[in-house]
Amino acid sequence: MAKKVDGYIKLQVAAGAANPSPPVGPALGQKGVNIMEFCKAFNARTDKFEKGMPIPVVITVYSDRSFTFETKTPPASFLLLKAAGLKSGSGRPNTEKVGTIKRSAVQEIAETKAADMTGADIEAMTRSIEGTARSMGLVVED
């Protein structure tokens, strides 16, 4: 018989850096999940990513306090900033541009994010990532 789902927890945790301190500890503690077990499993699964890269994770908690988790791809904004070589986006993206990014780099990011994005095709996903870039103050050039 299938386990009864008690709830879902959505977090963004740095790759290889999950520890019991906030935000991980309190979020898992409320549901009664073994925090150290999650931290060890998460760090083992994310060791292929660059240290410190934010990784979205969805944790499914069952009524017997066991859990499973699914990692997603890093946020598009993080990948765009990394590709452009910037620390942060613009506070006023319509008037203040902070950098440029090539369309080919945007397409690579769209292909990376394709597993997590809902879109008809790669072109639609690329346009979505371009919109994210513009809203961060990046100029997309050919």
Curated annotation (Swiss-Prot):
Q: Which family does it belong to?
A: Belongs to the universal ribosomal protein uL11 family.
Keyword set, alphabetical order: Methylation, Ribonucleoprotein, Ribosomal protein, RNA-binding, rRNA-binding
**GO annotation, biological process:** translation
Share the record's PTM remark.
One or more lysine residues are methylated.
| Organism in which the protein naturally occurs | Shewanella halifaxensis (strain HAW-EB4)
Q: GO molecular function, one example?
A: large ribosomal subunit rRNA binding
What SMART domains does this protein map onto? RL11
Gene Ontology CC terms: cytosolic large ribosomal subunit
In Swiss-Prot or TrEMBL terms, this protein is called: Large ribosomal subunit protein uL11
The record's subunit annotation is: Part of the ribosomal stalk of the 50S ribosomal subunit. Interacts with L10 and the large rRNA to form the base of the stalk. L10 forms an elongated spine to which L12 dimers bind in a sequential fashion forming a multimeric L10(L12)X complex.
What this chain does, per the entry, is described as: Forms part of the ribosomal stalk which helps the ribosome interact with GTP-bound translation factors.
InterPro entries from the entry?
Ribosomal_uL11, Ribosomal_uL11_bac-typ, Ribosomal_uL11_C, Ribosomal_uL11_C_sf, Ribosomal_uL11_CS, Ribosomal_uL11_N, Ribosomal_uL11_N_sf
